[in-house]
From Swiss-Prot:
Annotated spans, Disordered: 435-456, 575-712
Stretches with biased composition (Low complexity): 435-450
UniProt name for this protein: Pre-rRNA-processing protein RIX1
Name of encoding gene: RIX1
Species for this entry: Meyerozyma guilliermondii (strain ATCC 6260 / CBS 566 / DSM 6381 / JCM 1539 / NBRC 10279 / NRRL Y-324)
Signal sequence, renumbered to the chain: none
Gene Ontology process terms (BP): rRNA processing
Length: 712
């Protein structure tokens, strides 16, 4: 970073601009401790550069002002002086001013306005008073660089429509004058689009109902287009195509008011006059596209159905289906008319190409009919493709393929793939290797000759053609290959192609993959080709073969393809026996229940369960066989009043389940348990006798069992 003293000295005698601009940028340490006098000194030195008579110094000062405009303090203190000096420089520009200097000055003025716009106080004090002068100077210098100044005026129309209102008609007349000039056809497409888009934004300066002005302008353009299409009726028999007549009647006519477009003059004896017709159609279609694509600050209703009718009407005028009139007999005149029709079709395709990106799913109802019209644009020779015409009109075919891809991409699956057969064949035809016509004709003449050589020297170049014919092939341009790749990429992911066409597509993909193998050494594969290869693997169609090995050899580090090459399944779960888990759970439950049962057993032994036990009425000793029967669970369930047998049964169960039970210190219950289990009942009648004994209505009472007694 340069210190402030060095910057001031450099502004006095400028030599290199980059270090100065980098040191003055926003956030630089220079601004952290700059004083007020130093700031005034910096601004005055910069303004002195802009007042120099040397153009380089003025250009140097303009670029420094552009950097200083990011500083709020400088613009708040000296903004009015800076803007005034810039407007003086713009006023001094003339036809001898260099384009670099002029563009730098205009960009600096726009940057200063952008830095002020949005700040209420600065906008009120600096920008609003100077806006009329800025717009007026832009219109005054309009002839210096029309396309550039129109692009710079568009933001002022959107941001300041009220201030721009007095200049709206003047700008509109200048734009229309440029559009209707003969030189407009030589402008690049980007410049043409700028003029058309800016003209559509002028509707925002209307004081009342700008949306109505927008709609009326659009319908007037559509009516003018309909009138222009009827001129082709002077050369072609529209009466032979009833559908075309219906289409033209559905398109609204222009109003009876005076049109902004002058009438066309076409002389049948002057072939060059025919090209004014497609030029007028191109202007109208570009203007319609500008009205549809340019952003507006108001809500506008778009007649999408009429727009679709306009495109359909232009594409339906085709000399393949509509014959020429008898008056048109000259073959050269017919060929010129065919060429003008193709130019008109190209303009309509330009409008059709942008519609999917604007209206999306609203175009789906018109998609099938549009694709049918696009298929008719492919040159045919009887029932087969005219490959020579397809190759000769390579750019037009690429535009058709782009429109097809844009419309098919609106849906996730397109069912009617039979209508795409011609389009696929045409796409494959323009990417095939070609040989020049001169070499092919020379080769044919050589083969048809009788072997007589007039001169030995004449056969030298022909020998190269015969032995190394591949060196004379014309390579397909990269742009054409990209168009076809994009078209194929959309088709294989949205439609199931017929077997023959799918094989052609796969062959094309494999050839492109092999051609791209040299990119492996460079480490990069084009993104579009990468997507095409991946989609070709993901959508194999009805074929049993796969190009996965070839694609994997090229895209080795692709994560998606690595899943197909080395499938990674989820980790295998270990099988666990449920029985073991249940046994462990039972053991845990038993271990938790053992202390409780031990406490219950201790209470039973010590006679502490007085609350749960039912005291018997008598203390008679029960016979031995009766005591054994009480331990059976079935007998216990019969008498709900007796709870003592249930307690003894649970105690027995808890003790018998343990292999080596740990006896409590004062627990002496195991002895009566062993005595009760000593005799075994093997007869089934024992259980029956037990039930009969319990069901007997005798006066037998349950004696109290004294577990504390010592049998020994």
């Amino acid at each position: 970073m340069l210190p402030l003293a060095v910057i001031l000295s450099e502004l006095q005698e400028p030599k290199t601009i980059v270090p100065v601009l980098s040191s003055l940028r926003s956030g630089s340490p220079v601004w952290s401790n700059i004083s007020g006098p130093d700031q005034k000194h910096l601004v005055s030195r910069t303004l002195n550069l802009t007042r120099s008579s040397i153009q380089f110094r003025r250009w140097f000062g303009i670029n420094v002002i552009r950097v200083l405009a990011d500083n709020y303090k400088i613009m708040a203190g000296d903004g009015s002086q800076i803007i005034g000096q810039l407007l003086k420089l713009l006023e001094q520009c003339n036809q001898f001013t260099s384009a670099v200097y002029f563009k730098s000055l205009v960009e600096c003025i726009d940057h200063v306005c952008d830095s002020i716009r949005g700040k209420p106080t600065m906008t009120r004090e600096l920008l609003t008073p100077n806006l009329p002068a800025i717009i007026g100077l832009y219109l005054e210098k309009f002839s210096h660089d029309p396309a550039y100044l129109v692009s710079r005026l568009a933001p002022y129309i959107r941001a300041h429509p009220t201030t721009f209102r007095p200049f709206g008609n003047k700008l509109r007349s200048k734009i229309m004058e440029t559009i209707l000039s003969p030189a407009f056809s030589n402008f690049p497409d980007s410049s043409k689009d700028i003029f058309c888009n800016t003209l559509s934004t002028l509707c925002a300066v209307e004081k009342i109902e700008p949306e109505e002005r927008w709609s009326s302008d659009l319908f007037s353009l559509i009516g003018e287009l309909s009138n222009t299409l009827e001129i082709y009726g002077e050369f072609l028999n529209f009466e032979d195509d009833a559908e075309l007549g219906k289409l033209l009647k559905k398109i609204p006519r222009s109003s009876s008011g005076e049109s902004e477009f002058p009438s066309l003059s076409i002389d049948i004896n002057d072939p060059s006059s025919f090209y004014s017709l497609p030029e007028r159609l191109d202007i109208l279609l570009r203007l319609i596209r500008g009205y549809l694509s340019a952003p507006t600050s108001f809500v506008a209703k778009v007649p999408l159905g009429i727009i679709a009718l306009v495109v359909e009407a232009v594409l339906s005028i085709n000399s393949r289906f509509i014959p020429f009139k008898r008056e048109i007999r000259d073959e050269s005149t017919k060929q010129i008319i065919r060429n003008t029709l193709q130019c008109a079709h190209s303009s309509a395709l330009g409008l059709l190409k942008v519609l999917p990106s604007i209206f999306r799913g609203s175009l789906v109802p018109y998609m099938r009919r549009i694709l049918g019209l696009l298929e008719t644009l492919i040159p045919m020779k009887k029932k087969s493709l005219d490959t020579d015409q397809i190759v000769a009109n390579e750019q037009f075919i690429c535009l058709v393929l782009d429109c097809v891809a844009c419309n098919i991409s609106l849906v996730s699956y397109y069912q009617d793939s039979t209508g795409l057969v011609r389009l696929i064949d045409a796409a494959m035809a323009i990417v095939q290797p070609r040989s020049s016509s001169n070499t092919s004709s020379n080769t044919a003449n050589t083969i048809s000759s009788n072997g007589k050589k007039k001169k030995k020297q004449a056969s030298v170049p022909l020998a190269d053609v015969l032995s190394h014919q591949h060196l004379f092939n014309i390579s397909v341009s990269e742009s054409t290959t990209n168009h076809v790749q994009s078209f194929v990429n959309t088709l294989i992911s949205c439609a199931d192609l017929p077997s023959a066409q799918h094989n052609k597509v796969c062959k094309f993909v494999i050839v492109e993959a092999v051609k791209a193998s040299h990119h492996i050494q460079e480490g990069t594969v084009p993104k579009q080709l990468r997507n095409l290869l991946v989609n070709a693997v993901l959508h194999p169609g009805f074929e049993t073969t796969s190009i996965l090995p070839i694609v994997c050899s090229i895209l080795k580090e692709d994560e998606l393809l690595s899943v197909f090459r080395n499938p990674r399944f989820p980790p295998v779960l270990k099988a666990v026996e449920v029985k073991e888990e249940e046994e462990e759970e039972e053991e845990e439950e038993e271990s938790e229940e053992e202390p409780e049962e031990a406490e219950e057993a201790e209470e039973v032994v010590n006679g502490s369960r007085t609350e749960r036990e039912v005291a018997p009425e008598t203390k008679e000793v029960e016979p031995e066989n009766k005591r054994r029967k009480i331990e059976i669970p079935e007998a216990v369930s019969v008498e709900p009043q007796v709870s003592e047998p249930q307690i003894s049964t649970s105690l027995q169960h808890s003790i018998s389940n343990q292999p080596e039970p740990a006896e409590p210190k004062n627990l002496r219950a195991p002895e009566p348990v062993k005595q009760a289990n000593n005799p075994k009942l093997t007869e089934p009648s024992a259980a029956k006798d037990l039930r009969e004994d319990f069901s007997d209505d005798s006066d037998f009472e349950m004696p109290e069992i004294d577990v504390d007694s010592d049998d020994e």
